Amino acid sequence: MAAPDGTLNCEDFSMFQDVLKVMRNIDDRIVHSLNTTVPTVSFSGRVDASQTCRQLYESLMEAHLSRDRAIKTCIAQTSEVVGQLREQRAKDGDNMTTVKLLRKEQTKLKLMRSELNVEEVVNDRSLKVFSERCRTHYTPPTVK
């Protein structure tokens, strides 16, 4: 999502999705992470499960916030472009290039907004799996 200089490039939706896919690796591998780091009853004395669960929870929250910020930043940038194109279309409605570009940007904006729904599902699934494995070891802070 972020280029080496720290700026987001939201112009190409395919790249946007590819970067989100990479950013969702922690969620995709949550079950594996829990299985390899949270001990079963027979190994509970060898590993501090509460510390492990806390660290995993913090990593999850950091990833969720990072993706949420990235998606919302791209939505804001694309919304701004759509607004500018609407103004151009209002001034010169016969310019087909502007009309086509506006449709393209509106479609991209709609797809980016749908990523927020995907993000909600991914986050809920990860937190559910986390809670099932770590509920006896770590209780996350409540959000007010």
UniProtKB/Swiss-Prot annotation:
PANTHER family: COILED-COIL DOMAIN-CONTAINING PROTEIN 58, PROTEIN MIX23
InterPro entries, A to Z: MIX23
Keywords, in A-Z order: Coiled coil
Coiled coil among keywords: yes
Coiled coil regions in record: 82-120
Record's protein name: Protein MIX23
Pfam families in the record: MIX23 (PF09774)
Family affiliation: Belongs to the MIX23 family.
Taxonomic lineage: Eukaryota, Metazoa, Chordata, Craniata, Vertebrata
Gene that encodes it: mix23
Keyword tRNA processing tagged: no
Originating species: Salmo salar
Recorded GO CC terms: mitochondrial intermembrane space
